[in-house]
Amino acid sequence: MKKLKLHGFNNLTKSLSFCIYDICYAKTAEERDGYIAYIDELYNANRLTEILSETCSIIGANILNIARQDYEPQGASVTILVSEEPVDPQLIDKTEHPGPLPEAVVAHLDKSHICVHTYPESHPEGGLCTFRADIEVSTCGVISPLKALNYLIHQLESDIVTIDYRVRGFTRDVNGMKHFIDHEINSIQNFMSDDMKSLYDMVDVNVYQENIFHTKMLLKEFDLKHYMFHTKPEDLTETERKEITAALWKEMREIYYGRNIPAV
């Protein structure tokens, strides 16, 4: 896309929001309580603050304020307000490619807020437990929050991810013409690294004329031992392993497709 010479500030708002899900099987009530306590501690407000603060570092933003809260009986929220920084337009990368990984860092952000909320959940029947984290990165200016996507998905490894990206508003060039998007994008997938894309089955639902992009991700490989909490698959009977595997896959597909699947 040809570089635009703008009249005043770039007034486009770019919002990236995604849900990540972690699924687990806990055989007993004690194990279910243990999983909820474990995941709640793993993603407590302090840990989430570290992840989001590193995100700000990656995109080169100044943190103005941090509001964080752990909730009872479970869950946490963190919101970070970020200030704009001077940006040299010549240094802005508007190409469609993956953002940095945790070990690679440099981009600039004009203005942003970043927030995350967590939702651990379980049910006494079936032994299935889920953990959901909702994350939103919203910016005003020349940089797309998609540059933070790769890092955040790597940090919050998950079984299912649903991602939404939208560009709102408009900005004007020096001739007064309105521009409703200032960068090229065909798919959110183009902002993910190859190793990330190789791990997931993905599908896009995009409304290009409205600058709305949606991608869903489902982990390809399934190893039962990674989904058991304090129980080893070898300690179960073959029938139990098959039943638990079927229940986990059904749960994951229902979340991925956003609808209940009738039992066959």
From Swiss-Prot:
Cofactor comment text: Binds 1 pyruvoyl group covalently per subunit.
Active site: 112 (schiff-base intermediate with substrate), 117 (proton acceptor), 140 (proton donor)
Free-text description of this protein's post-translational modifications in UniProt: Is synthesized initially as an inactive proenzyme. Formation of the active enzyme involves a self-maturation process in which the active site pyruvoyl group is generated from an internal serine residue via an autocatalytic post-translational modification. Two non-identical subunits are generated from the proenzyme in this reaction, and the pyruvate is formed at the N-terminus of the alpha chain, which is derived from the carboxyl end of the proenzyme.
A family per Pfam: AdoMet_dc
NCBIfam families: SAM_DCase_Eco
Residues the UniProt record annotates as site (Cleavage (non-hydrolytic)): 111-112
Catalytic activity: S-adenosyl-L-methionine + H(+) = S-adenosyl 3-(methylsulfanyl)propylamine + CO2
PTM sites of type Pyruvic acid (Ser): 112
Species of provenance: Citrobacter koseri (strain ATCC BAA-895 / CDC 4225-83 / SGSC4696)
Origin superkingdom: Bacteria
EC number: 4.1.1.50
Pathway recorded for this protein: Amine and polyamine biosynthesis; S-adenosylmethioninamine biosynthesis; S-adenosylmethioninamine from S-adenosyl-L-methionine: step 1/1
Keywords, sorted A to Z: Autocatalytic cleavage, Decarboxylase, Lyase, Polyamine biosynthesis, Pyruvate, S-adenosyl-L-methionine, Schiff base, Spermidine biosynthesis, Zymogen
GO CC terms, sorted: cytosol
Transmembrane segments: none
Family in the record: Belongs to the prokaryotic AdoMetDC family. Type 2 subfamily.
Biological process according to GO: spermidine biosynthetic process
InterPro entries listed in its UniProt record: AdoMetDC_fam_prok (IPR003826), S-AdoMet_deCO2ase_bac (IPR009165), S-AdoMet_deCO2ase_core (IPR016067)
Swiss-Prot/TrEMBL cofactor(s): pyruvate
Subunit composition and interactions: Heterooctamer of four alpha and four beta chains arranged as a tetramer of alpha/beta heterodimers.
Name by which UniProt lists this protein: S-adenosylmethionine decarboxylase proenzyme
